[in-house]
């Protein structure tokens, strides 16, 4: 079962690569199948009086994301191209449920260390390992676009129609203009 607590938005930061795309195509949005954000300290050992102590050399952050593949999706293709060209991305990971009246999230500039496309008889996934440039930043926003939180809300809704009122497929239907239509009501 896919988790529904977080969504991710990845945006191409490189303006030359991004200008080849619409804003929607340059921003990859997905619900996370899996993910994580790791903050690690690079520790330095200090020996004092025959005992070990530690101090910090640096801090490193890594973000791992697993997304469902959408064949032909221009955002996913641009993501793959940004990896090949070693371009920076902006990433936001948002909580889908509000806390204290706001959506909480994490933002970072990242470079992709690894982009793996994996598939089997059940799954078709992209797994990403990204290294954070310098540091991530926590933040909040009042509202996320409704279509981000519920993408299926954008799907067409079929309304009831009388028999023989239309012809052709749903996508190509046209109202029938025949003079004699039979009443097929029950």
From Swiss-Prot:
Source organism, top-level taxon: Viruses
Protein name per UniProt: Putative tail protein
Organism of origin: Staphylococcus phage phiMR11
Gene (name only): orf50
